[in-house]
């Protein structure tokens, strides 16, 4: 039986107890230095000391910081983690932004939060000139704290107040600032601590020693990665940072990792390595955690049968990453997102939409009470926008997005995700999106030009298995991959408006 992980009461407890008292000599963060060869290890003792330095720096720079926003605009790095804790413990509101967005998007988000400071890595991602022109006096380097003195910490965090803002990906329009509290974080930490205990008790390979190390290529500005920054100190585990997908195999080879949070496309890459007999490239990686999109259950089953542990999860920024987890390694439930945790309530409403109620649910959308009221009802249920079903064993399955439903002239509702899943079974289809066009169902397909006839034949056969109202009546072939966001999610609005290379009426 694994020793129970003591969940911290908040961010202050995380630093002063978990980092400084319980695990000071454990490695907290690893990364590969600029020479591309040297692995830098930061232990929890040094991590906590740097957090204290950041608190000192911020209080000196902005004496009236309480309740004001400090923005992080940077690739994955150790200083990002230090700043995240430092901003909160200095009384500020942590804001993490995607540094690779267009200036129009960044200008909007920065205008929303009105930052007191912007900590950034100095890299030009395409709009450096505009950033300096608009916010030059507020810009600071990520390591701005390095010459400061470690200061005293006080527990200044309002447990139910605004602790951080994280913007949604905005796949269908302007992004929204999700307001999150320390209570939201702690609710999620309860779940993640139980996940860690489950790993230790039921998933650990023979001979595997603790503490574990977790590789992340996901961006720290995204909740799927950020939640690891907050959930690993209570267990004393390490986070191995990779800042660029081009360095993934180099970094994985230099830093042994047990677990990896991954976008679906990277899981497929790892599967291909396994199929080609190149498992040595993975350097002992054995646990894959995936969210954001459905994966082929046959692929997951094969990975699980050959020594990998595969965990799927369903969480949202609006719930601090908390949600539904799937630890099963058997084929009958591999396509499910899992079962709900025990710390929130879950249900399907009358339309089949997944709803969540509990301490992990956000405070609301920043400066947008109308949008908040649209997703959190009077009884406190957060309406996720995802449609689902529950099987007889209590497993949840995602069937589509409510806002993506196509309403046809005959009144029938059709889920594009259902048809996309069927099209994905065609070997020639690399990517696809289904849309409504002139009251007909149309598929946009990315594939090799010489395989377009194969796709057409597949759709013809597929249509024979579908009711008339669900049949695909047009296909567009595009020469370019479909647009996706930083986490690999399909951008449907842009995908629907692609200029197709060819249009074939079936």
Question: Residue spans of the language-model regions?
Answer:
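N-lobe entry segment of adenylate-forming
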Residues: 1-61, 66, 85, 111, ...
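Conserved pre-ATP/AMP-binding loop-to-beta segment of ANL
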Residues: 24-27, 149-167, 173-174, 203-213
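Conserved AMP-binding/adenylate-forming
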Residues: 40, 55-101
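Conserved AMP-binding A3 loop
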Residues: 41-45, 163-190
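AMP-binding/adenylate-forming catalytic core of the ANL superfamily
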Residues: 118, 358, 363-364, 387-470, ...
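Conserved AMP-binding/adenylation subdomain of ANL enzymes
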Residues: 186-213, 220-284
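Gly/Ser/Thr-rich phosphate-binding loop
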Residues: 252, 258-262, 271-332, 345, ...
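Conserved ATP/PPi-binding loop(s) of AMP-dependent carboxylate-activating enzymes
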Residues: 339-342, 349-375, 395, 410-414
